[in-house]
Design a protein with these regions (language model features):
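Solvent-exposed, non-transmembrane loop/terminal regulatory segments of multi-pass membrane proteins
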Residues: 19, 34-85, 130-154, 398-402, ...
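Hydrophobic, glycine/alanine-rich multi-pass transmembrane helices and their short helix-loop junctions
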Residues: 232, 261, 320-363, 368, ...
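Cyclic-nucleotide recognition modules
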Residues: 787, 837-894
Length: 923
């Protein structure tokens, strides 16, 4: 491992006291930030940050008022004196609360009806609440005859009524939703009585409940995750050290991550609530790699410090690369335009960076001060029967996979293609209410309102005429009426209210008989007169002051952005075909969320592509091969595509929660791929045979892959206990991805690795290549130091003790040797057995090259005169060099041809001397 990085990774091993002090200091600083952590229960994070529709929405609400409403449902016999008194008192109480801009109920909204002296425009209760049955019956008749009331404020059967409180929270007041919804609860509690069912539902209560659920998830998910990982670690390591160390760094990583969220003012919301559990699980996985390598070194007979040093060196590179790819992968989310995903991208990237520091600081520190486990100390140097049997089964399985690589690859390809169809069928659906389970009080109340009245949700449809008094034009009025009639025919839309309802009701009162249809006057002057008769406070929500624009309030029970988007498309088609001379545009928080959902559908693909590109570039740089970089993506891409196929098959929507499954999955599963490929590179350098290297890699990595994958699946499974439906979906999909990734790593990776030769940048940096050797070595003539390192890593570096033979006469050996350091002597023996020195080979010198191109039987011996390092190359190694680094290989082949030419010339000269009887020595 390169000097600086190696020193950083091993710093805590050599400086345990300083490392412990630093760890405690960082943990303390993180803990001190926790009180500053913000809980964001709003739905603004679900919207696009730079959406032009957001500016339009602000303009609409400034003109017609807020669409943020709280409903107080009253169920029972509404047209009785006690019930009407309750409705009146609740209306008055809500109107007195801070932030309330308007209250609509049967007690506050004007009713238009005929009177003995002509026309009456007043609230139903303006003369007080009648106590006699006849008076109550007349009140009921008036209310149920008014289209503004029926379905909007009172049910058609008179058994339910609702009080609508529209709110506009003070700017910057983050406690409004909690405070206001609790104040409404107090009002409801005061008015509760036998015979009436009273409850509230609406934006403030929903947002308050979100905040409460976020806090509950923090209280439940993290302990459940710790308990799950504790059980998994006990099964896997069976030592206190193997249990405590990963949990310690995992919990510390979660603490540091949350502390960083608080420090950078990243709130805890319905999406970022999963970050602590995520980093806890990921931190556990990285710790397991180091501890597994450490225990393997102890079993091999190394003492504590050498074992720990080797383990950190072995696992450090994959952990560093995995962290870089994972952080950059999650970092792609910050380029999203959805606030909640941007916040998750920052939070996850910061937390995973903290996890890297905590792992490489905490794990070596704990292992350094922890006594060597007795079980490992006693079994040092011994191979267990069970372990040997498992290795044999792994090798047989790997052999089977390599022999049947084509049908296995075809099976994975077929599943992937089928899953692409499933991905295509995934629907985009995000909605704040859909975050709650069907059994939750929020969903139950919403459904009750939907069944009883016109729906618990609302949005606006604004008709802009572009001219003053344009709304007073009867033609415009009739077009608005047509839009309302169409909307009420769309499934899920229960009621629309506009200025047309007021005008037509007033016109009917003047001109029509009871029961006659309501129509808009044909005369603009009559329409204008009707508008003047109305109370501006009552109609301000439906028409602006210059009568330039009209607002249609749409009450609906549409669930999620999918249904809303379909309804809006139908509205657009109707407007395009039937409406002329005006502009029609929808507005509302639900509309903004819907636009974000459409954006998210595209962003899920682009974010996935960006993540793949980042990982591919890093791996291509690490293994110095675009081919290797692309191959490394396949075991990670396949599980993600399969997960989207499952989403399509099970009709799981793409929401703000599940949209992250691709980024999370590929960010985590890449860990096993990096460990696999780095191990394969090292095994290939040792064995020089792809098949053998693949088998040894799988023997080494099988346990960590299976163990970590199952642990990750269990850890993500804990998130299924979340109170939020998208988090539950994310958990279940992540469990599937972890298992699919495990199968991909165990089955696909061996096939892919066997098809390529891997050399890592880290390996090249490890090779020492001084300028003197480059100058003296004829095989390396014209090569840069970097290219020379590639050549060295293509072959095998062999260390030889003094007196050790590299070649013996008569051996079958087709390798070329280059002395890297030390000295070799090439010797022969005459007929009398007397040894003769044929040549002394110094660093940079080459011997054995003719055996590589000839029949391979050696005619001389080569022995080390001192401690010597030699580089061994055969034709297979040169062929690998040609495929991986063709320009470097061309220089090596040129140099080899030059060396062989010189050897041929030397041999010819020597033969001439011998034939002439000269005794000139051979060199």
């Amino acid at each position: 491992m390169h000097g600086l990085v190696k020193r950083l990774l091993l710093w805590s091993v050599g400086h345990p006291l300083w490392a412990a002090a630093l760890f405690v200091a960082l943990s303390t600083l993180a803990a001190l930030q926790l009180p500053r952590l913000e809980i964001d229960e709003s739905n603004e994070g679900l919207m696009l940050e730079r959406d032009p529709a957001r500016l339009y929405y602000d303009q609409v609400t400034a003109t017609f008022g807020s669409d943020e409403l709280t409903m107080v449902m009253v169920k029972g016999d509404i047209f009785t004196a006690p019930a009407l008194e309750v409705i009146q008192r609740i209306s008055e109480s809500l109107a007195g609360l801070q932030g309330v801009t308007r209250v609509d109920s049967v007690a506050t909204v004007d009713n238009i009806s005929a009177a003995d002296d002509g026309l009456e425009i007043a609230t139903l209760l303006h003369d007080g609440i009648p106590t006699d049955p006849a008076g109550l019956a007349r009140l009921r008749e008036k209310a149920l005859a008014n289209p503004v009331f029926v379905g909007n404020l009172v049910s058609a059967d008179g058994r339910a009524a609702v009080i609508l409180a529209f709110t506009a929270p003070p700017a910057g007041d983050k406690t409004f939703n909690v405070r206001f919804s609790k104040q409404v609860d107090d009002v409801v509690a005061r008015e509760s009585r036998p015979g009436l069912t009273i409850y509230q539902i609406g934006g403030p209560l929903i947002k308050r409940t979100v905040g409460e659920y976020v806090e509950r998830d923090q209280v439940t998910l993290i302990p459940y995750s710790v308990l799950t990982l504790f059980i998994v670690l006990m099964i896997g390591f069976r030592t206190p050290q193997g249990v405590v160390a990963p949990l310690f760094t995992g919990v510390s990583s979660a603490l540091w991550g949350v502390g960083l969220m608080a420090f950078f003012h990243i709130p805890m919301n319905v999406v970022t609530v999963s970050v602590p559990s995520l980093v806890l699980v990921v931190g556990f996985a990285e710790a397991v790699h180091i501890i597994s390598a450490y225990h393997r070194c102890l079993r091999a007979g190394l003492t504590k410090i050498p074992a720990l040093t080797e383990a950190v060196e072995e696992a450090g590179l994959p952990i560093l690369v995995t962290t870089a790819t994972t952080v950059l992968g999650f970092g792609t989310l910050i380029f999203s335009d959805i606030t909640i995903l941007i916040q998750f991208g920052y939070a996850a990237s910061l937390a995973l960076t903290a996890n890297f520091v905590a792992t490489l600081l905490g794990i070596p520190l704990l292992l350094r001060i922890w006594p060597t486990p007795k079980r490992l100390r006693e079994s040092a140097g011994e191979a267990s029967v069970a372990g040997t049997a498992l290795e044999a089964r792994i090798e047989r399985g790997c052999d089977f996979i390599l022999r049947h690589r084509i049908p296995i690859g075809a099976t994975f390809a077929a599943l992937t293609v089928a899953s692409l169809w499933g991905w295509y069928s995934v629907k985009v659906d995000t909605d704040f209410v859909s975050y709650f389970p069907e059994s939750s009080p929020i969903r139950q109340r919403m459904q009750d309102v939907d069944r009883t009245l016109a729906g618990a949700s609302a949005f606006f449809v604004v008709v802009d005429t572009g001219r003053d008094n344009g709304v007073a034009d009867p033609a415009t009025m009739k077009q608005i009426a047509g839009i309302q009639q169409f909307l009420e025919s769309v499934p899920g839309i229960g009621k629309t209210v506009s200025i047309v309802d007021y005008v037509s009701q007033l016109h009917l009162t003047f001109t029509g008989a009871p029961g006659a249809p309501r129509t808009v006057p044909d005369s603009p002057d009559v329409v204008a007169q009707h508008l003047l008769l109305m109370d501006r406070a009552q109609t301000a929500r439906f028409i602006d002051l210059p009568a330039r624009s009209a607002n249609i309030l749409v009450r609906h029970s549409l669930t999620g952005s999918w249904e809303l988007s379909r309804a809006l498309r139908q509205l657009e088609q109707y407007v395009a075909q039937n409406v002329r001379g005006v502009q029609v545009q929808s507005a509302g928080q639900a509309i903004l969320t819907n636009r974000a959902a459409d954006y998210m559908a595209v962003n899920s693909v682009t974010s996935f592509a960006y993540t793949l590109a980042v990982i591919g570039l890093i791996h291509s740089a690490l293994f110095m091969s675009v081919k290797a970089g692309l191959l490394s993506l396949i075991p990670n891409v396949v599980p993600v595509i399969l997960s989207f196929g499952v989403m399509g098959l099970l009709d799981i929507p793409l929401s703000t929660g599940t949209a992250m499954v691709a980024t999370i999955a590929i960010g985590i599963t890449v860990d096993d791929t990096v460990h696999n490929m780095v191990t394969y590179s090292r095994q290939l350098n040792e064995h020089l045979d792809e098949r053998t290297a693949v088998m040894r890699t799988m023997v080494i990595q099988f346990r960590p892959i299976v163990f970590i994958s199952m642990a990750l699946a269990a850890g993500f499974g804990v998130m299924a206990f979340s109170h939020f439906v998208p988090t539950v979906h994310l958990a279940l999909l992540s469990v599937f991805v972890m298992i699919a990734a495990m199968m991909s790593e165990l089955v696909l990776s061996p096939i892919l690795m066997a098809s390529t030769r891997l050399v890592t940048v880290w390996d090249l940096m490890r090779i020492r290549m001084n300028a003197e050797l480059l100058r003296r070595a004829p095989l390396l003539t014209g090569l840069s130091r970097w290219e020379a390192r590639k050549v060295v890593l293509t072959g095998v570096l062999q260390s030889m003790a003094p007196g050790e033979y590299a070649i013996r006469r008569g051996d079958l050996d087709r390798q070329l040797y280059m002395v890297v350091s030390g000295r070799m002597v090439v010797i022969d023996a005459d007929l009398d057995g007397i040894e003769r020195t044929l040549a002394i080979v110094e660093p940079g010198g080459v011997f054995g090259e003719t055996g590589m191109v000839g029949d391979g039987y050696r005619t001389f011996s080569a022995r080390a005169e001192a401690a010597t390092d030699v580089l061994r190359l055969d034709f297979a190694a040169l062929e690998r060099l040609r495929k991986r680094f063709p320009f470097t290989a061309a220089k090596v082949f040129r140099n080899l041809a030059t060396i062989l030419s010189e050897r041929l010339q030397d041999t010819t000269t020597a033969l001439l001397y011998l034939s002439s009887g000269s005794d000139k020595p051979r060199t």
